[in-house]
């Protein structure tokens, strides 16, 4: 306005607007924009550079790193539930505590008291925050953590988590083929409407948009986890890979309605054997999505997931995915 330069713009005020509304009509002193822009560029650069260094602002790439040592110490001492509760702001900060097979779901009174960096140092693969709700991605041990934290809040000594030796995929096997657990359509993880899966916080894998409600084992192996609400099942393959089949999104809230488990923990299963029945119509009506992520939670360094098929797939169809 001071220089009487008048150039219109649509959305971004970028170079296209500059050309269309300034240079081409040639009805205003558009050339003055260039020296003014250069002056502001210098002001912005040195102004923000000074502010960032003066007040140590956490711009991308300059975030403070979190020490990882406390993670091992807490786990070794059996104090993980106490540490997690403290990182959530303590007993008095907890409004509601819940969990599913992937994460702790916590409503808190004061989100400012939640130490997200500490939760990550304690083993959370990620921490999601929406309003006063926190989701800490602790994987299959989330439900055990929930029970232990509830015991602490009630003044009881928490039950010790059963120490299960960590399973490593067999180094002898060069690769392992995975069958589709459901009929439907193969969907990339990136398209799953839950960032815990789409951002691979629990591991790599694939997803199926199912067309019928029978779930079969994608491998020969052993059932290692059947979640109480039956919406998710963990399997250890003969090759040592741990596989999580999570039917639908936010289906933990259905409290088992629409799900019938056909196996129990410890059962040996064969590839293609039915392990779960799902009332898809009920789940469609009561959950955000029926898309079913299949996650490999213990991939070793250098192992990659290769999705060999796109589009329609049949339940039990072999080699839709290869791990190698």
Curated annotation (Swiss-Prot):
Give UniProt keywords alphabetically.
Cell membrane, Kinase, Membrane, Phosphotransferase system, Sugar transport, Transferase, Transmembrane, Transmembrane helix, Transport
Residues that span the membrane, as ranges: 5-25, 28-48
Q: Which residues form the PTS EIIA type-1 domain?
A: 194-298
Q: Keyword S-adenosyl-L-methionine: yes or no?
A: no
Low complexity bias located where? 167-177
- Which SUPFAM superfamilies does UniProt cross-reference here? Duplicated hybrid motif (SSF51261), Glucose permease domain IIB (SSF55604)
The reaction(s) catalysed by this protein are: N(pros)-phospho-L-histidyl-[protein] + D-glucose(out) = D-glucose 6-phosphate(in) + L-histidyl-[protein]
Q: Domain named PTS EIIB type-1: which ranges? A: 78-159
Question: Is the Cell membrane keyword given for this protein?
Answer: yes
> Which EC class does it fall in?
transferase
Instruction: Give all residue intervals belonging to the PTS EIIC type-1 domain.
Output: 1-63
**Chain intervals for the UniProt region annotation (Disordered):** 156-177
Give compartment(s): Cell membrane
A single GO CC term for this protein reads:
plasma membrane
Tree of life domain: Bacteria
Q: Name the GO terms of the biological process aspect.
A: phosphoenolpyruvate-dependent sugar phosphotransferase system
Q: Which GO terms describe its molecular function?
A: kinase activity; protein-N(PI)-phosphohistidine-sugar phosphotransferase activity
Q: Where is the active site?
A: 100 (phosphocysteine intermediate), 246 (tele-phosphohistidine intermediate)
Q: Name one Pfam family in it.
A: PTS_EIIA_1
Instruction: Report the EC number(s), separated by commas if there are several.
Output: 2.7.1.199
The cross-references to PANTHER family, in alphabetical order and at most eight, read: PTS SYSTEM GLUCOSE-SPECIFIC EIIA COMPONENT
Query: How are the domains described in the entry?
Result: The EIIC domain forms the PTS system translocation channel and contains the specific substrate-binding site.
Q: What does this protein do?
A: The phosphoenolpyruvate-dependent sugar phosphotransferase system (sugar PTS), a major carbohydrate active transport system, catalyzes the phosphorylation of incoming sugar substrates concomitantly with their translocation across the cell membrane. This system is involved in glucose transport.
What name is this protein filed under?
PTS system glucose-specific EIICBA component
Q: Which organism is it from?
A: Geobacillus stearothermophilus
Name of the gene this protein is made from: ptsG
């Amino acid at each position: 306005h001071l220089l009487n330069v008048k150039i219109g713009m649509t959305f971004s005020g970028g170079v296209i607007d500059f050309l269309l509304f300034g240079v081409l009509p040639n009805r205003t002193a558009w050339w003055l924009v260039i020296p003014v822009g250069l002056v502001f560029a210098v002001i912005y650069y040195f102004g923000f550079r000074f502010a960032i260094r003066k007040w140590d602002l956490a711009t991308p790439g300059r975030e403070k790193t979190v020490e990882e040592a406390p993670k091992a110490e807490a786990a070794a001492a059996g104090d993980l539930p106490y540490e997690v509760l403290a990182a959530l702001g303590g007993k008095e900060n907890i409004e509601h505590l819940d969990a599913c097979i992937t994460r702790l779901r916590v409503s808190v009174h004061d989100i400012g008291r939640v130490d997200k960096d500490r939760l990550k140092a304690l083993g959370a693969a990620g921490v999601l925050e929406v309003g006063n709700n926190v989701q800490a991605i602790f994987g299959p041990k989330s439900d055990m953590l929930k029970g232990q934290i509830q015991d602490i809040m009630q003044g009881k000594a928490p039950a010790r988590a059963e120490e299960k030796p960590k399973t490593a995929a067999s180094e002898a096997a060069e690769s392992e083929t995975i069958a589709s657990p459901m009929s439907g359509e193969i969907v990339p993880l990136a398209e799953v409407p839950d960032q815990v899966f789409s951002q691979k916080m629990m591991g790599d894998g694939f997803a199926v948009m199912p067309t019928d409600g029978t779930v079969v084992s994608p491998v020969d192996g052993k059932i290692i986890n059947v979640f109480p609400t039956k919406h998710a099942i963990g399997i250890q393959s003969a090759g040592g890979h741990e596989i999580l089949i999570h039917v639908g999104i936010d289906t933990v809230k259905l409290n088992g309605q629409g799900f019938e488990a056909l196996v129990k923990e410890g059962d040996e299963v064969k590839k293609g054997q039915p392990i779960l029945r799902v009332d898809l119509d009920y789940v469609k009506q009561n959950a955000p999505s029926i898309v079913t992520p299949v996650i490999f939670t213990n991939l070793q360094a250098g192992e990659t997931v290769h999705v060999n098929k796109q589009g329609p797939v049949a339940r039990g169809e072999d080699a839709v995915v290869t791990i190698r």
